[in-house]
């Protein structure tokens, strides 16, 4: 895990989708998708449920994102 991955994660939560997060961060969508996949595999949790309307955080994902926000605030 690194700070960039945490920023991507928080942006997905904030903007509701990987593509919207990529646009807001001026980042490549595949990079954000890969970062999300890496975090989910590293921590063995599903952070978001994927749907046709966007990304919805799971309960575990919501807690993980709250921790990520705290790290980014410091």
PLM features per residue range, with description:
Residues 6-13, 58, 65:
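Hydrophobic residues on short alpha-helical segments
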Residues 40-57:
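A short LG(V/I)-centered, amphipathic sequence patch enriched
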Residues 22-23, 58, 62, 69:
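Residues within alpha-helical segments
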Residues 2-5, 29, 61, 68:
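The N-cap/first-turn positions of alpha helices
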Residues 42-43, 64-74:
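Alpha-helical linker/hinge and terminal dimerization helices associated
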Residues 10-28:
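Short helix-boundary/capping micro-motifs
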Residues 17-18, 36, 50:
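Helix-turn-helix DNA-binding elements, focusing on the entry/boundary residues of the two helices
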